[in-house]
From Swiss-Prot:
This is Peptide chain release factor 1. Belongs to the prokaryotic/mitochondrial release factor family. Methylated by PrmC. Methylation increases the termination efficiency of RF1. Pfam families: PCRF (PF03462), RF-1 (PF00472). InterPro entries: PCRF, Pep_chain_release_fac_I, Pep_chain_release_fac_I_sf, Prokaryotic/Mito_RF, RF-1. GO terms for cellular component: cytoplasm. HAMAP family: Rel_fac_1 (MF_00093). Keywords: Cytoplasm, Methylation, Protein biosynthesis. The modification N5-methylglutamine is found at residue 235. One of its GO terms (molecular function) is translation release factor activity, codon specific. Its main location: cytoplasm.
């Protein structure tokens, strides 16, 4: 391993010990904000420190095995130990390189998940509903919380549009690669001839950001309309103008929220989604500029980004970004998404490593 990387790892190990000492300080414990920030830093440093300690231990094993090679009686055993230790050393070096990759500060945040029906009419709305159920199952398995912020239901089931907030550990980091176009090929329930139809929906995943980090939104740039909510809501439906539609005039971004019975709560929810959308649009512009010379696995949430095709007659799902095809569609639709998400994450990390090595 390069001496510059070893030096960086030694510095991180020292910082890990420093942070641990700070966490035992009574003054730090009394300051909850500082204590939380240091606790997060300690957790982030723990994996890389543990891996580095094991790597160092393996280097000692390699050295000991090499010394035993001079002893004829021990040579055969030493050769086996040396082979095993060198293989483990390579594994740990790869792990350390990944652990040293620049972290996206948004990865640990909650996120807003938006699913919109695209081409395909009623079938597209039904598919959007299936997608929302798939993500909800995935979230449930990871003990994340899913809260619907706004929903416009399809006439024959599913959703024309649904926006949900997903809360939990590392939510955005896991779901961010879902942004883009998703296509379904199947025979719709309404199809009497048994013909396969192609429908689509778009998914957008944005980090949920605290109020303090919200982009500055000028009240004069907003048009706020109220209207009567439709759909679920019991006796309050169509009796009060509690639903809110906010239009951000400079960008044309429109957010509707009608899930709550209180207009004030709907407005607060809509503003949080609007802030996240504006920030996501700004971040996307920056990412496009940075990634203009290399492929970008992070979709924009635009229908032109073709992420996956879900082919029901063949029980097949294909991720077009990395040419991955799995014949496990039933499991995927039940929320077992790690088999699709992890290969994308690994490919993204490989691209990052490649970019770093080019800089070196």
């Amino acid at each position: 391993m390069k001496s510059s990387i070893v030096a960086k790892l030694e510095a991180l190990q020292e910082r890990h010990e420093e942070v641990l000492a700070h966490l035992g300080d009574a003054n730090v414990i009394a300051d909850q904000d500082r204590f939380r920030a240091l606790s997060r830093e300690y957790a982030q440093l723990t994996d890389v420190t543990r891996c580095f300690k094991e790597w160092r231990s393996v280097q000692d094993d390699i050295e000991a095995a090499e010394m035993m090679l001079d002893d004829p009686e021990m040579r055969e055993m030493a050769q086996d130990e040396l082979k095993e230790a060198k293989a483990r050393s390579e594994e740990l070096e790869q792990q350390l390189q990944v652990l040293l990759l620049p972290k996206d500060p948004d990865d640990e945040r909650d996120c807003f998940l938006e699913i919109r029906a695209g081409t395909g009419g009623d079938e597209a709305a039904i598919f959007a509903g299936d997608m929302f159920r798939m993500y909800s199952r995935y979230a449930e398995a990871r003990r994340w919380k899913v809260e619907i912020m706004s929903a416009s239901e399809g006439e024959h089931g599913g959703y024309k549009e649904v926006i949900a907030k997903v809360s939990g550990d590392g939510v955005f980091g896991q779901l961010k690669f879902e942004s883009g176009g998703h296509r379904v090929q199947r025979v719709p329930e309404t199809e009497s001839q048994g013909r396969i139809h192609t429908s689509a929906c778009t998914v957008a995943v944005m980090p949920a950001i605290p109020e303090a980090e919200m982009p500055e939104i000028n009240a004069g740039d907003l048009r706020i309309d109220t209207f009567r909510s439709s759909g679920a809501g019991g006796q309050h439906v169509n009796t009060t103008d509690s639903a809110i539609r906010i239009t951000h005039i400079p960008t044309g971004i429109v957010v509707e929220c009608q899930d709550e019975r209180s207009q004030h709560k709907n407005k607060a929810k809509a503003m949080s989604v609007l802030g996240a959308r504006i920030r996501a649009a700004e971040m996307q512009k920056r990412q496009q500029a940075e990634a203009s010379e290399r492929r970008n696995l992070l979709g924009s949430g635009d229908r032109s980004d073709r992420n996956r095709t879900y082919n029901f007659p063949q029980g097949r799902v294909t991720d077009h970004r990395i040419n991955l095809t799995l014949y496990r569609l039933d499991e995927v639709m039940e929320g077992k998404l790690d088999m699709l998400i992890q290969p994308i994450v690994q490919e993204y990390q490989a691209d990052q490593l490649s970019a770093l090595s080019e800089q070196d």
